[in-house]
Each structure stands twice: as C-alpha cells, then as structure tokens.
C-alpha cells in the first residue's frame, strides 16, 4: 500500500487565500496551512519550509496559492528544484504554485525564467524550472480559489469527492470569491462576494487565531456555510444578519466536548476559555513567560486573563507580525518585559517593539524575544580577569 503524500499549503491571508485553502481541504488531507499576511514575509516562510523538506525522507507536496512571485520567492523556486535533483529516485518532492498576478509574470521574466503557455492546461502559463515535479502556473483570468479547484489533480491525485451539497456550496464559494477578487462588479455574485469578504475580515482573527489547530477548520466551515446561504438566495443584508448565528453554531460544534464550557457566555468568551488551556497556542520561555503569536488585541486580552487566572503563567506576551509586543502580568513584571524592548506602559499591561522590527512566525518571534528577556550568562573563559580570579598563586 502506497501512502498519500503529506500536503502542506502556504497561502495568502485574504479571502482568496482562505478560499484556496478551503478548496484544497475539500479534496486533500492537508496536514498544515501557513497563512502569509504580507508578501514581504513569503521569502522567510518558504526558506523555513525548504529547510524542513531537505530533511524529510519521504516525498511531500508543497502547495502555494495566491502569494505573488517576488524575487525572494523565485530564488526559492530555483533552490527547490536544485534540492529535488539531489534526492533519491521516488523521493522527489512536488511543488505546486498557483498564482494569478500579472506582476508575477514580469518578475519571472526579469529573473530569466521562461514563461510559456502550458500545452497540457489551456489558458495557463507555466514557468520552466526543468523539473517535472515543479508546477508554477499562472492564470490572470481566474482567482486562486478557482485555480485550486481546477488544478486539484496536481496536489490530490486521489482526490476526495465532496457530497452533493458540499460540492454545490463549494461552487458558490468559488463564484463569489472570483467575482470579488477580480473586481467583476457587473456579475450577480459580486455583491455576495463583498458580503462574504466583510464577514471573513470580521471573523478571521477575532475568534480562533491562525496559530491554533482549530483555525482553518473554523474559517473554512464558516465560508462554506455562508456560501450555502448565498446559493439559497440570501441577500448581502441577510448574510450579515445571520453571520453571528453561523459563528455561534460553529463554536457550539468546536466546544461540544470541552469541559467547563458555559453556553450562556458570548462566542468569544467561550473560545477564550478553551484557547487559554491550549498547549498549541503558546511557547513557554525559559523564565516561564508564555508567548503567543499573531493574536488580535481583544483575543489576547481575554485569553491572557484566563491563562493567568488558571495559574499557567504569571506573565504572557503576544507578538504581532508587525513586531509589536504586548505584555500582560499579575506580578508587576509586564513593564519590566516591555522596557527590555524599548517600550513602556503599566506595571501589568505594557508594550514594546521587536529589535528586528517584525516576525514572520512564532518560531521567529521566540528567537528574537528569548535572548532579550533571558540573556545567556557572559562567557568569561577568554577574559584575563577570570584567569586572575581563579589563580591561587
């Protein structure tokens, strides 16, 4: 029995990017999704992925959607192909890049990569990396969500088959996202796409953060439920009115087996209790401070209160992609932490700024915060004063 390849997806942090991850999850068992909010972060993210893939024994698939191909990403494409050439037969990784930005074509040509019509896929351009397992496809006429659907055979050769209702909702989602993302104002689906986009931004960071395992399931289920309402004829106003009901129903499902859940609270308050118990959301620094990454300010306030009340930590810090830090504490040490990062505030609520100005992942945030909060002891082995101290004459 041949096991299916592990599939990892890197996608843009917008409606089209999440539409693409929703479609991919409908056809493949995607093991991990990385959402990239800024194109400037794509380079560091793909380099981290390349390091991981170099050490992977079995072949895997990396799916990249709606990211735009800038110079660092194109350099990664070349390094990926070079890595693949050195791997054993049968262990070659697969790279599938689905993009629709005109600027990507210009950048590929500027980096001396041949871009030509794909003879196997009408209407698509393909960049030649001289590797049959590397598919860099560009389609200016369609959004990434539709491309992920139409090119599913590349990342899901034995694709799952959605049920009839799910397939119809998926088609409605694709139509709405494409109308919005390509700004097709004259199409009937545009108004629904705009309402879908508003609901997406109201929900994507305020309930289940991207660093939590529930995140992608929650947002994809929300988009599919909303698409189902649009398919049934709901107006944008009706979708707006019912969005709270959709979110509450999904939260009920997520928390069905959670001990201590209180359904009389708001969805955000209920989720905060569950998130505060999560090991996946935090990294414990060497001084006991718990670090989270990318939580919006309201979520961090609710979750950090629950964490400290439960006795999990006396100090919690949240790092944003833009490099801002928010410290909360119950022992007056939040201000001490913020001062280490050129910040200030109150004794138990303060903020600062990362020395490098930004962070692209929780691991990157930990690497910057740990040595500042908890600097290693100085190495005295090369100091002449240390030698004198130990000399007994």
Annotate each predicted stretch with a short phrase.
Residues 165-303, 309-310:
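Phosphate-rich cofactor/ligand-interacting catalytic cores and adjacent structured alpha/beta frameworks
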């Amino acid at each position: 029995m041949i096991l299916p390849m592990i599939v990892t997806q890197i996608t843009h942090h917008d409606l089209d990017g999440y539409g693409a991850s929703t479609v991919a999850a409908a056809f493949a068992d995607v093991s991990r999704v990385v959402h990239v909010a800024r194109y400037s972060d794509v380079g560091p993210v793909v380099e981290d992925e390349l390091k991981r893939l170099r050490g992977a024994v079995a072949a895997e698939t990396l799916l990249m959607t709606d990211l735009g191909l800038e110079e660092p990403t194109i350099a990664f494409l070349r390094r990926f192909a070079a890595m693949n050439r050195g791997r054993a037969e049968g262990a070659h990784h697969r790279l599938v890049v689905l993009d629709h930005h005109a600027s990507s074509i210009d950048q590929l040509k500027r980096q001396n990569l041949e871009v030509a019509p794909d003879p196997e896929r009408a209407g698509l351009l393909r960049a030649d990396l001289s590797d049959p397992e590397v598919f860099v496809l560009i389609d200016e006429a369609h959004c990434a969500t539709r491309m992920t659907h139409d090119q599913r055979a590349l990342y899901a050769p034995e694709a799952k088959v959605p049920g009839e209702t799910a397939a119809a909702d998926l088609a409605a989602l694709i139509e709405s996202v494409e109308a919005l993302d390509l700004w097709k104002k004259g199409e009937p689906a545009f108004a629904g796409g705009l309402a879908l986009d508003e609901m997406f931004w109201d929900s994507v960071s305020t309930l289940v953060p991207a660093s939590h395992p529930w995140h992608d399931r929650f947002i994809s289920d929300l988009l599919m439920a909303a698409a189902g309402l649009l398919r049934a004829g709901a107006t944008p106003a009706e979708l707006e009115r019912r969005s709270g009901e959709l979110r509450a129903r999904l939260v009920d499902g997520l928390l069905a087996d959670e001990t201590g859940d209180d359904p009389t609270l708001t969805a955000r308050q209920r989720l905060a209790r569950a998130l505060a118990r999560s090991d996946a959301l935090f990294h414990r620094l060497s001084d006991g401070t718990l670090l989270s990454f990318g939580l919006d300010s309201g979520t961090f306030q609710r979750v950090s209160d629950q964490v400290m009340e439960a006795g999990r930590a006396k100090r919690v810090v949240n790092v944003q992609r833009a490099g801002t830090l928010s410290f909360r504490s119950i022992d007056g040490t939040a201000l001490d932490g913020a001062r280490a990062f050129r910040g200030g505030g109150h004794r138990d609520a303060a903020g600062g700024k990362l020395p490098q100005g930004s962070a692209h992942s929780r691991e990157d945030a930990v690497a910057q915060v740990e040595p500042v909060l908890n600097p290693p002891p100085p190495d005295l082995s090369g100091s002449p004063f240390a030698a004198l101290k130990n000399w007994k004459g």
